[in-house]
From Swiss-Prot:
UniProt family annotation: Belongs to the complex I 30 kDa subunit family.
Annotated GO MF terms: NADH dehydrogenase (ubiquinone) activity; quinone binding
Catalysed reaction, written as an equation: a plastoquinone + NADH + (n+1) H(+)(in) = a plastoquinol + NAD(+) + n H(+)(out); a plastoquinone + NADPH + (n+1) H(+)(in) = a plastoquinol + NADP(+) + n H(+)(out)
Gene: ndhJ
Record function comment: NDH shuttles electrons from NAD(P)H:plastoquinone, via FMN and iron-sulfur (Fe-S) centers, to quinones in the photosynthetic chain and possibly in a chloroplast respiratory chain. The immediate electron acceptor for the enzyme in this species is believed to be plastoquinone. Couples the redox reaction to proton translocation, and thus conserves the redox energy in a proton gradient.
The protein's name in its UniProt record: NAD(P)H-quinone oxidoreductase subunit J, chloroplastic
Keyword check for Thylakoid: yes
Record's subcellular location: Plastid, Chloroplast thylakoid membrane
Main location, first listed in the record: plastid
EC number: 7.1.1.-
Native source organism of the sequence: Ranunculus macranthus (Large buttercup)
Amino acid sequence: MQGRLSAWLAKHRLVHRSLGFDYQGIETLQIKPEDWHSIAVILYVYGYNYLRSQCAYDVAPGGLLASVYHLTRIQYGVDQPEEVCIKVFAPRRNPRIPSVFWIWKSADFQERESYDMLGISYDNHPRLKRILMPESWIGWPLRKDYIAPNFYEIQDAH
């Protein structure tokens, strides 16, 4: 079953794949990394001007990494928001996805956290660096193949 946004994207020949609907009836779409930036701009102009959240996860050990965007469009009133979930999958070896910081400023810390925990590089992000882990940390702690170090250095908070 194709949702309203998926039908609109198909009508305008914008490449995507419908992944169905979640339990709340929110449409989920898959976008290729190379198409993500242009489609993100189109979605913003179309009215999806609120990035509710961005997160990332490791699909499977040795598999793809996913960056997930929850977008909201309020056209008919705040009590009737139109929402969509966008998933962008990237290869584990060199996970690169265009940053949407310049479209939705709220992506700033969220993309940095995804970089810090999973190692996804968000191209053209102005401050892409670790946000939770120390700069000297080696590895990506939320990857399923991450091996935790045997010790942790306690640092003075002063």
